[in-house]
Amino acid sequence: MFNLPEVATRLSQNVELLVDEIDKTGSQPNCGNPTLLGPKGLAARDEIILAAEKLLQQGRGPGPSLLSLLESAVDIGTIQTLIRLEVPDQVPPTGSIPYDALVKKLKTPVAPELLQRLIRFTRLAGFLDEDEEGAVKHSPMSAIFVSDPDSAGQARFMADFGIRPCSFIYESIKLDPSGEATRQGPLALMAREPGAREGPTFFEVLEKDPVNRNRWHDGMAVHNDSMVRHVADAYDWDTVKSLVDIGGSEGHVAAVIANAFAHIQITVQDRPEIIEKARQRVDRHRNITFEEHDFFTPQPRIADAYFLRLILHDWNDADCTRIVRQISSALRPGARLLIMDAVLPEPGEGSLQSERQLRRSDIGMYTLFSAKERSLVQMRRLVEDCDDRLRFEKLYTPPGSHASMLSWICE
């Protein structure tokens, strides 16, 4: 049971800390972007969120708190519906629009009264709003659909593609208690043919769905923007002269490293269609070259270091083993394997808010890929079982980063 006065005191103290950090950095308190905050500000922000949630639980009590969590399916389903109806896209950036006019702009017919019921519910959660005349206008949350294309793409992906697999978790466990069978995972079951026991993988589904494939890339852009800035500070790059960025997309991360460390020659490897786009970029860095490569085949490059950033959490243990072993074939004594991924803490270790985010990501990887986020113990076991020459060096988590850098040296 939470101590209510103690939680309230902690909340007040951390609000003061956060306000102080906001004043120092000049960031906006309601922008939702913590990247300008220092370690103290980030910690205070997490504590405020946690304390506020504890106060809600304390105020509701155990039973109502559980029911509130389950009832949030109504919130999610209603917001999901408004996004899929493309309602936020049809609301003007400024001003408002009457319901009768709004429904005429939608591709899917819906009665004005029903649409009004949906919006009058979601506005209580901060999604869309009404003006004094009862016409629809944007809230700060819904305004991302007209002001932030990448975040909007991520939201559309979640509404159309990311939420539904969660309802198949129980059925997936009945078919595959290990959670490792890619074609029996929650998403595979969602996308399977009627009556089938197996379904397609995430990437096979996206291959046939260009709309959600683009939304997925938009979502990754949001994810990358919030994390790329940590890469340059996550490792002592002065010790590296040649680097292979495996699965490095169009070289956004490689460019951050190359701009900060001009001595490094970087080879970015990815699928042919991605490398083709990368080679067409006008802002290519002179120290970066691009190469088509399937990371399930032997690594062709000899380098000082090999970098896997946000790759392994998309794959189950068997596939991760295949990926690391293909890199291992190219390792020479003194070469390093660098993995930047989320690292699950032990229960209660560190910030509870951070742990919640990481464990949500873990279950998200399971529902979409039959994959996982891993603890340090799990990551070390996976890598070191592939090649006994690899000796673990260290783990470093940059302040404010969702991911940690892990390094091994080949002896």
Curated annotation (Swiss-Prot):
Molecular function as annotated in GO: O-methyltransferase activity
Superkingdom of this protein's organism: Eukaryota
Active site annotation, chain numbering: H313
Pathway(s) where this gene product acts: Alkaloid biosynthesis
EC number(s) given by UniProt: 2.1.1.293
Record's keyword terms, sorted: Alkaloid metabolism, Methyltransferase, S-adenosyl-L-methionine, Transferase, Virulence
Residues engaged in binding S-adenosyl-L-methionine: D270
Top class in the EC scheme: transferase
Catalysed conversion reaction: 6-hydroxytryprostatin B + S-adenosyl-L-methionine = tryprostatin A + S-adenosyl-L-homocysteine + H(+)
GO annotation, biological process: alkaloid metabolic process; methylation; secondary metabolite biosynthetic process
Function: 6-hydroxytryprostatin B O-methyltransferase; part of the gene cluster that mediates the biosynthesis of fumitremorgins, indole alkaloids that carry not only intriguing chemical structures, but also interesting biological and pharmacological activities. The biosynthesis of fumitremorgin-type alkaloids begins by condensation of the two amino acids L-tryptophan and L-proline to brevianamide F, catalyzed by the non-ribosomal peptide synthetase ftmPS/ftmA.
Protein name, entry field: 6-hydroxytryprostatin B O-methyltransferase
Designated gene of the protein: ftmMT
